Amino acid sequence: MMNDIIADALTRIRNAAMRRLEVATLLHSNTVVGVLNVLLQKEYIAGFKVIDGQNNKKTIQVELKYDDNEKSVINEITRVSKPGRRVYKSASEIKNFKNGYGTIIVSTNKGVIANDEAYAANVGGEVLCTVW
């Protein structure tokens, strides 16, 4: 049984990017879909689609994005808040990451959003992961 589906999804994306695969297959979760929406909005991935599988088990296929040199657009993707150690930050604490080159993905009462949106809306929340 898997305890942290978000960490599993991030690891699958990281491993697929290291192998230069075009598509990574993830397990479905509404939170994972929220994280992928932020990654798509910030142009870290090319796209994703939810696929219905057998026995009502859904999967997600993520199209990874690479630059002209066939290097992954995602340099590093790291899980921050974990089931054993939750990390919460206020809006002022998540204002900037990697001098604006990176993104913090935050789960708030307004949904899963990026750090710049959370700062603009003046909401904090659980820091799910960081990407740059």
UniProtKB/Swiss-Prot annotation:
PROSITE patterns, per database record: RIBOSOMAL_S8
Entries under Pfam families matching the protein: Ribosomal_S8
Gene Ontology CC: one annotated term: ribonucleoprotein complex
Family: Belongs to the universal ribosomal protein uS8 family.
GO biological process, one term: translation
Function: One of the primary rRNA binding proteins, it binds directly to 16S rRNA central domain where it helps coordinate assembly of the platform of the 30S subunit.
Quaternary context: Part of the 30S ribosomal subunit. Contacts proteins S5 and S12.
Record-level Gene Ontology MF annotations: rRNA binding; structural constituent of ribosome
Protein name per its UniProtKB record: Small ribosomal subunit protein uS8
Keywords: Ribonucleoprotein, Ribosomal protein, RNA-binding, rRNA-binding
Top-level division of the source organism's lineage: Bacteria
